[in-house]
C-alpha cells in the first residue's frame, strides 16, 4: 500500500490516473485500488478479455482451440522474448480441457502468444488462425458477450463499483 500511495500522489500531482492491468491474481488488491485511488484509475482488461474469448473458442470450436493451443506451446519461447514472465513449459500440458484453462502457466502462455497466434500464416501466406477465430467469435457472439460481461462484472464487483 505504501508504494501505491506514492504512485497515487504522483498521479494526483500531474492529473493522471493509475493504470491497473487486470488479472485473476489481482482481484485481492482491487478493494485497496478502489479506496486508495479515490476512483482515479484505468482498468486495462484487453489481455484477460482475450483469454475469455479463447474460453469461448474452446467451448464452441474445440478443434480450433486445440490447434491454437498446440501452436502457442510450440512458439512459447519466441513469445517469452517479448515479455518478462515466468512460464515454465514443463507445467504446460500438451493438451487441456476446460478445467485446465485456469492454470496459471496455461493462461500466461495463451496470453503472451496472442500476437503470434493472430499473425501466424500458412505456407500459402493465408492467416493460420485469425480468420477462423474471428468467424468462431462472430458465430458465438451471444456467448462471447455473456462471457466477457461476466468477466468485467467480476472486476467491477471486486472494485466495489457494482454490487454482487
Question: Where would I find each of the regions flagged by the language model?
Answer:
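Active-site capping/gating regions of soluble enzymes
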Residues: 1-163
Amino acid at each position: 500500500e505504501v508504494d501505491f500511495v506514492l504512485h497515487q500522489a504522483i498521479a494526483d500531482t500531474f492529473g493522471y490516473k493509475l493504470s491497473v492491468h487486470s488479472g485473476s491474481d489481482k482481484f485481492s488488491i482491487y478493494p485497496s485500488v478502489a479506496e486508495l485511488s479515490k476512483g482515479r484509475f484505468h482498468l486495462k482488461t484487453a489481455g484477460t478479455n482475450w483469454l475469455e474469448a479463447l474460453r469461448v473458442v474452446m467451448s464452441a470450436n474445440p478443434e480450433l482451440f486445440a490447434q491454437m493451443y498446440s501452436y502457442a506451446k510450440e512458439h512459447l519461447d519466441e513469445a517469452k522474448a517479448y515479455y518478462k514472465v515466468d512460464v515454465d513449459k514443463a507445467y504446460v500440458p500438451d493438451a487441456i480441457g476446460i478445467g485446465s484453462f485456469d492454470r496459471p502457466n496455461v493462461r500466461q502462455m495463451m496470453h503472451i502468444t496472442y500476437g503470434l497466434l493472430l499473425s501466424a500464416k500458412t505456407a500459402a501466406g493465408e492467416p493460420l488462425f485469425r480468420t477462423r477465430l474471428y468467424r468462431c467469435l462472430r458465430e458465438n457472439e451471444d456467448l462471447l458477450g455473456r462471457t466477457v460481461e461476466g468477466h468485467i462484472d467480476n472486476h467491477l464487483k471486486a472494485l466495489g463499483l457494482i454490487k454482487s
